Regions:
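Residue-level detector of flexible, active-site-proximal loop/helix-junction positions
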Residues: 63, 98-100, 173, 216
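N-terminal Sec-pathway targeting helices
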Residues: 5-25
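Alpha-helical cap/lid subdomain in secreted, periplasmic
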Residues: 17-18, 110-248
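Serine-esterase "nucleophile elbow" of acetyl-processing enzymes
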Residues: 33-97, 113-120
Length: 248
């Protein structure tokens, strides 16, 4: 009897292991699809602003884009934010999966056509968030270098005469997913150097500062793979940004 029970437990563990491995493969394939479809320009349904609308540009990486958000693009945070702000606002999603603030990283945001589209939108309000991908050991060249590179990106938006407000967001935590943090993101660096550098940039340029690390700390259940928010996580993100805008 004990032998049969042990065999059943072993069999159950194997089944669970196969299912978990399958889920990991699906998650990885989903992110790759987001990368390549984004590169083909197929996943950015940008809106034309009506005359008199306040134009809001949400700039960032896959967290802004909405990778793994069920119900994308309507459930991605920029779309949810647009619905919350309501009539008189046009909110566009300029998030690009895998991209970095640093121009010398392996996937710099400034090298993408979407970056120029974000500039040409001539937004009244810009909400920017980078750092998760910059934290990777292969791309990290130190906090001062990150600040200098991110500064150049910020200044390119501040140089637009249309801009009235700009917010910079510190990225949320990165948790383990089946035993490790995915995509080579350095979770300690996101918590420490990236967060500190983002605060420094907010002070340097007098930007609104939104600390998503603090907002999402302890809320692992709101992340699909430990890095990307679920639809509920995207809703909380949108609510946080909405509150910041309304406080102005």
């Amino acid at each position: 009897m004990n032998g049969e029970t042990a065999k059943k437990r072993t069999s159950a563990k194997r089944v669970i292991g196969v299912v978990l491995a399958f889920l990991i493969v699906i998650a990885e394939c989903g992110l790759l699809m987001a990368y390549y479809m984004g590169e083909l320009g197929q996943l950015h349904p940008l809106k034309e602003a009506k005359d008199g609308d306040v134009k809001v540009a949400c700039v960032g990486d896959s967290i802004t884009f909405g990778t793994f958000v069920f119900g994308w693009p309507e459930a991605a945070y920029p779309s949810v934010l647009g619905n919350m702000l309501g009539k008189g606002y046009t909110v566009n999603n300029y998030g690009y999966p895998g991209r970095c603030a640093q121009s010398d990283a392996d996937r710099p945001y400034v090298k993408e056509e979407l970056y120029q589209k974000a500039l040409d939108f001539n937004a009244d309000v810009v909400i920017i968030m980078f750092g998760s991908n910059d934290s990777k050991n292969a791309d990290w060249k130190g906090e001062e270098h990150f600040i200098a590179e991110y500064s150049a990106l910020i200044e390119s938006f501040l140089a637009r005469p249309s801009i009235k407000e700009m917010y910079i967001m510190a990225p949320p935590p990165a948790w383990e997913f089946f035993g490790k943090v995915r995509y080579n993101i350095n979770s300690d660096r996101v918590k420490n150097e990236i967060n500190r550098a983002t605060r420094t940039l907010a002070d340097k340029y007098d930007l609104g500062f939104i600390d998503l690390y603090e907002v999402f700390d302890g809320k692992r259940e709101l992340f699909a793979d430990g890095v990307h928010p679920t639809d509920k996580g995207a809703k909380l993100l949108a609510e946080t940004v909405y509150s910041a805008i309304r406080r102005k």
